[in-house]
Amino acid sequence: LPRLQADAERHEWPPRWLMGQLREQTVLVVGLGGIGREVARLLAAFGTCVIGTSRRGEPVDGVSELVHPSDLADVVGRVDGIVVTLPATAATEKLVSAEVLDAVRPGATLVNVGRGSVIDEDALVTALREGRVGFAALDVFAKEPLDPASPLWDLPNVIISPHNATLTPAEGR
């Protein structure tokens, strides 16, 4: 999306490029509560290989492999995308740490629709600048609203939304 937006701003029609297909991807869903289970189900419906984190190890429809949250650094190098859906707790604070982000497969996509405190934002900025994380879609942040001085605003490989992922038409009324 950032690439397409940049081309549009320059009024350029770029040559076509090969895009990855969901059925060719492996995605790690960090947190298999209600939202995480639904994300896993939808990804699996498209043929995506889904790995999920679980402290209890209970099977989840659509999830082909379960890992403990403490093993994130061991698994992120095998995935193309990471979707974080965890709540903010003492146990989840900065769970996606510098160590985890250092181990990410170069160019991986990171989506956070859980809580901002789950990701070490400073480490994420570094990972985005270095290309370890190729793209991030962030709906939540450690402190909201996101500080206007945050470097996340200026990174071309980041899309920011204002904690809008859970807003439904009923809530908007």
Regions found by a protein language model. Give the residues of each.
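Gly/Ala-rich phosphate-binding loop of Rossmann-like dinucleotide-binding domains
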Residues: 40, 44, 128-129
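Conserved acidic E/D residue at the C-terminus of a beta-strand in Rossmann-like folds
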Residues: 54
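C-terminal helix-to-coil terminal segments
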Residues: 144-173
